[in-house]
Amino acid sequence: MSEEQLKAFIAKVQADTSLQEQLKVEGADVVAIAKASGFAITTEDLKAHQANSQKNLSDAELEGVAGGTIGGTIVSITCETCDLLVGKMC
């Protein structure tokens, strides 16, 4: 798994509004967009990241989600092909 590549891609998406817009398009292919941006990630990387992210939520993050409010910006990447959501609160 290329966790470093995925983390680097997420960081780039957070800083690049053009990438954010590309990923918001319905049916956007996250892996293809990442590849076009110079990152080598796979669907398996996205699945593993999602599984790990769900396991590692803090109590504050869980409370924020349950309450419907989060005091930060959430950058999310949705893979329409595999129906995954990769997100990070900043």
Curated annotation (Swiss-Prot):
Modified residues annotated as 2,3-didehydrobutyrine in this record: T69, T73
Induction: Down-regulated under nitrogen starvation.
Covalent cross-link site, Lanthionine (Ser-Cys): S76-C79
PTM remark: Cross-links are proved in vitro, when coepressed in E.coli with the ProcM lanthionine synthetase. The lanthionine residue has a DL configuration (with 2S,6R stereochemistry), whereas the beta-methyllanthionine residues have a DL configuration (with 2S,3S,6R stereochemistry).
Propeptide: 1-68
Pfam family membership, one: Nif11
Keyword annotations from UniProtKB, A to Z: Secreted, Thioether bond
GO cellular component, one term: extracellular region
Subcellular location: Secreted
InterPro entries assigned: CHP03798_Ocin (IPR022516), Nif11 (IPR012903)
Cross-link (Beta-methyllanthionine (Thr-Cys)): T78-C82, T81-C90
Superkingdom of source: Bacteria
Role, per record: Lanthionine-containing peptide (lantipeptide) with unknown function. Does not show antibiotic activity against Lactococcus lactis 117 and Bacillus subtilis 6633 bacteria. Organisms that produce this peptide live in oligotrophic environments at very dilute concentrations, suggesting this peptide is not secreted to influence other bacteria.
UniProt-recorded name of the protein: Lantipeptide prochlorosin 1.7
Organism expressing this protein natively: Prochlorococcus marinus (strain MIT 9313)
Gene: ProcA1.7
